Design a protein with these regions (language model features):
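Glycine-rich phosphate-binding loops of nucleotide-dependent enzymes
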Residues: 2-258
């Protein structure tokens, strides 16, 4: 298949989502290419969180269309998204502080042996540790021993563990919700390096952030939501921070933002 005919990794069109009498999404649409980072921006209440929850299966859409690799897909539950290769790294990371790095990578999806007449299933620890090391090496993530409790890790290291867990399961698309929030300068730089490395390895990435400097450092495409609809989608190289801020705040007319 030629590059021109190759479908985009993800396309969302006309997404609508209501919570009772409140319409959270009224017309959301954007796309994500393989090997690229799409920054999803907007002020508080613009619909960013609802959009990623819709794609992740947490808050299924009421109307609209989601296409993955050119094919319409139905995502009604997080397990649907996982089966399609969509993983989300939420802001709280969902890590268990008392468990080690490897245990967190496989949390809820541990590899176990087949049952035998002589005893119960047992964890395949050696296999899990080997695969964990492979993924961490591929992503150039340097961490302490795999049995180190994540409670002892820095904020950047914890974020790295969550990202590694997201790509451990044959993922195609990784959604990141504010991955650099509350991180220091050095830790932020490392997480942004990870974001670009993911794209460089062929993953599609949706990045939610309020940091405009980070956006213009790592994003390939920028999509802006305002009041539940997409008001801007363009290549980062064709935009300026002022134009993006204007779309976010509503001081830039939608026609001018398109």
């Amino acid at each position: 298949m030629s590059a021109a005919a190759d479908p985009k990794l993800l396309v969302v069109r006309g997404l609508r989502k209501r919570f009772g009498a409140v319409t959270a999404l009224r017309n959301v649409g954007f796309s994500v290419e393989r090997g690229e980072v799409t920054a999803l921006l907007g002020d508080n209440g613009a619909g960013k969180s609802t959009t990623i929850k819709a794609i992740a299966g947490v808050a299924p859409i009421d109307e609209g269309e989601i296409l993955l690799e050119g094919h319409p897909v139905t995502i009604r539950h997080p397990s649907d998204a996982t089966a399609l290769g969509i993983q989300t790294v939420y802001q709280d990371l969902a890590l268990c502080d008392n468990l080690g790095i490897c245990a967190n990578l496989y949390l809820g999806r541990e590899l176990v042996s087949r049952p035998t007449p002589f005893g119960p299933r047992v964890l395949r620890d050696v296999e899990m540790e080997a695969e964990a090391r492979r993924v961490l090496k591929t992503l150039r993530i340097n961490l302490p021993a795999l049995d180190t409790p994540v409670a002892s890790l820095s904020g950047g290291q914890r974020q790295a563990v969550a990202i590694a867990r997201a790509v451990l399961w044959d993922s195609k698309l990784v959604i990141m919700d504010e991955p650099t929030a509350a991180l220091g300068v050095a830790q932020t730089a490392e997480v942004l390096r990870l974001v670009r490395d993911l794209a460089g390895q062929g993953y599609g990435v949706i990045l939610i952030t309020h940091n405009m400097q980070n956006v213009f450092q790592v994003a390939d495409t920028i999509a802006v939501l305002r009041l539940g609809e997409t008001v801007l989608e363009a290549r980062r190289a064709d935009l300026t921070p002022d134009r993006v801020v204007g779309a976010i705040t509503g001081t830039l007319a939608i026609g001018a933002a398109a």
